Amino acid sequence: GLWSKIKDVAAAAGKAALGAVNEALGEQ
């Protein structure tokens, strides 16, 4: 359903955001 699609997109976006934050912190 629509909710499962939204959850999948939100989970993917969250993982991408965490990855970007981890990369930024790792460079410091």
From Swiss-Prot:
Its main location: secreted. Possesses a potent antimicrobial activity against Gram-positive and Gram-negative bacteria. Probably acts by disturbing membrane functions with its amphipathic structure. Expressed by the skin glands. It is found in: Secreted. GO terms for biological process: defense response to bacterium. Belongs to the frog skin active peptide (FSAP) family. Dermaseptin subfamily. Keywords: Amphibian defense peptide, Antibiotic, Antimicrobial, Secreted. It comes from the Eukaryota. InterPro entries: Dermaseptin_dom (IPR022731). The keyword rRNA-binding does not apply. It holds the Pfam family DD_K. This is Dermaseptin-H2. Transmembrane segments: none annotated. GO terms for cellular component: extracellular region.
